[in-house]
Amino acid sequence: MAQAFQFELVSPERLLLSAQVTEVVIPGNEGYLTALAGHSPLMTTIMPGVVSVKLADGKTDSYVVFGGFADITPQGCTVLAESATHVDDIDPADIQHRIDHARKVLEDASSNEHRTKAEIFLHQLMTLQGAILPA
């Protein structure tokens, strides 16, 4: 049986989850990563995506996050999200609103650097939309 560790998912509004888990999959900026008990210390930024959690009792749960960072230690993992919600509570209109806003930011980009960042963010949102919402 996998060893459990403490996991917390926090948004500015509230603590979404504080539980003993055996595995957490996080959408890091360099790709998805899996945190397990005893993981080497790591701090990483996260991209919009789905945080998947395997609870100590074997149940799984998923949360949609929109940026932030993850702090992983051998004893636990904390995700501080800019915005987060349970996957079952996602409002398709909210995702579409974020995509529309990202498109506007892209149109108004004043430099190549801003344009590149806006393109990446828009792509991440559209990927997230395709992953969690039915076609």
UniProtKB/Swiss-Prot annotation:
It is a peripheral membrane protein. It is found in: Cell inner membrane. InterPro entries: ATP_synth_F1_dsu/esu, ATP_synth_F1_dsu/esu_N, ATPsynth_dsu/esu_N. Keywords: ATP synthesis, Cell inner membrane, Cell membrane, CF(1), Hydrogen ion transport, Ion transport, Membrane, Transport. One of its GO terms (cellular component) is plasma membrane. The keyword Transport applies. Coiled coil: none annotated. GO terms for molecular function: ATP binding; proton-transporting ATP synthase activity, rotational mechanism. It comes from the Bacteria. Disulfide bonds: none annotated. F-type ATPases have 2 components, CF(1) - the catalytic core - and CF(0) - the membrane proton channel. CF(1) has five subunits: alpha(3), beta(3), gamma(1), delta(1), epsilon(1). CF(0) has three main subunits: a, b and c. NCBIfam families: ATP_synt_epsi, PRK00571.2-4. Produces ATP from ADP in the presence of a proton gradient across the membrane. Belongs to the ATPase epsilon chain family. This is ATP synthase epsilon chain. It comes from Brucella suis (strain ATCC 23445 / NCTC 10510). The gene is atpC.
